[in-house]
């Protein structure tokens, strides 16, 4: 229900008092009831709408709105936080860095106060008496939050007021602001009451009752508990029994798959792994935010003397509540599924390798286990089981402390499917992602077949999940297995939730996640066949909207890395690569001199290892790969050491790496073994390719050195900023310097003077490119001083000369200039 003018529990809005005659339903005669049963949906809709509009005068002055609490700032001049606009500016910076965590709640307005109520427990979180509300303002369409309600409140015990910001979706902020302002006006004892008229206006603007449907409602589908779960489980079990172990059909398919089919399958697994890492990172940050709120709440309770709640403690209590157990279970399942995917992809990803990602995941896994009070909840997560390859891979990869954590999780994390009884049902795992993304179907497998299998697995998984919830609910009535979780109001909070023995620090897992911001697997394969380098010139400016896109300027010359789709992957002269739409590019026949880097910089992006997916024809050489990390020298490793990153099997896959000598030295043995397995003519062709590429690279390097690597200057106007520059000019300047979208959106809201006032540490705290921004600002300041220094000096000298001349004329002494002219 999208309204607020209803006395139904499904919506939020003005509800009637029990004292005004609407608390109980009036008596109806038998004829009236028969007439009502025959009333059409449209007539019923009109009756309800008229009732909602006409009964405003008879309802109590209590209105409720569902809002999202964005953040709370202390208005302090030291923090440059004085007005609502300052708060909106800081909100934009936090939003650009992904640090805004919304909290759903109910905002209630009556004739005495504005209250914040917990959506689930209905407990009052905050209470702001109307006389403590200093300012109320609606802010629309200033950032990604398009309807913001700003409340400035200061209680007598506070030294500085608080600024509370709410996002209002169901009822717009301007209507809620009008309601609050009218309540404040009436509380001051005005002769004419404003609030009834304001409520009537709100009801007219948003009656809150949806129109009747044009067609009768469809028959609802059967729920998970209503479907024939046993038949579906039997069907799934029969299919699994026919196929045997889950690894067997995969191996069978691998023998028949073409390189393109395997590439598509690996690409899908890579996408699933990326979304799993995203969801785990989000959950860890959510845990960290809850821990921070709990820590702040504990400090406040220790410092204050009375038991009365202080300002802001209610919202802190709500934010300190940990996620529900179901979210912990989902996170553990994604950890297990992620380990399975890493074992499958260990030969196909690099920089970092699958082994590095295993070490990377064990730190947040340890934090989640601690947050649940121990390994009990994690050990109860049965599906998905780890595969045999995964168990072998982890045994070879994990360190001593990681192995200790792994062993503590029990047999559900150690035993493969073959070690469980055949009659025991293991529900299939269907991952569900926070953003609603679903893995793409594999076309070569047959969409109907795979879709049927997916739906079957999902229905069985839903049934198993429903059964698990019922079992956990039944167990919770007998004895609380999760005693460390607080009650619904969130006030009883156990320190053991976040502190249980000598464990890892609160932010360590989050820092581990932040340490590799670009840890996503590269989903893009190079074409199978070797092609000469292609270049294109951009016809227009293009600003990247995410990390996978690349910002380009008009007339930029770009190297084309992948042009198989509508968005082409290109590399600019600085070595940065990303996707741009192909309709802004013009193909160039010959590359301009000096364009493109032969040694692109090191990147932290996980890339797919270029390996042969199947037998290849003799006349199909492999293409040079995009920049992977230097391959390690194959040295025998102990069992606890990470698995070495697989290297390309074909020597034609020589890539432009920063340490090409180490790669060539470390790959001689592999190359010789590879050559022994190939025909002589095939070996010669590959050697010729390597020699040709080496000759071309040497030739390019020599010619570039002779030309002194002259890069043609583009006819792009130079963009500078001054202290008087507007935020739009600052944003344009940042884009022209090639900063990423996060930096542009974070700093593009500042004017020139505000940007110049920030030091390096402040810039680093706002955006990851803070050091580079500071250096560019320093250059701009120096340019301003060079351009305006002489004129300012002349102005100062002119004023000084006027003063000397005036003093000389009063005393009868000639000025310096006059004296020197004689």
From Swiss-Prot:
The keyword Ribosomal protein appears for this protein: no
Ordered alphabetically, the record's keywords are: Actin-binding, Cell membrane, Cell projection, Cytoplasm, Membrane, Phosphoprotein, SH3 domain, Synapse, Synaptosome, Ubl conjugation
Renumbered to this chain, the Basic residues biased-composition regions fall at 299-309
Which spans does this entry mark as compositional bias, Basic and acidic residues? 466-477, 671-685
Q: Quote the PTM field.
A: Ubiquitinated by the SCF(FBXW5) E3 ubiquitin-protein ligase complex during G2 phase, leading to its transient degradation and subsequent cell shape changes required to allow mitotic progression. Reappears at the midzone of dividing cells.
What InterPro entries is this protein classified in?
EPS8-like, EPS8_2nd, EPS8_PTB, Eps8_SH3, PH-like_dom_sf, PTB, PTB/PI_dom, SAM/pointed_sf
SH3 domain location, by residue? 531-590
Family per UniProt?
Answer: Belongs to the EPS8 family.
What this protein is called in its record is: Epidermal growth factor receptor kinase substrate 8
Q: What organism is listed for this UniProt entry? A: Rattus norvegicus (Rat)
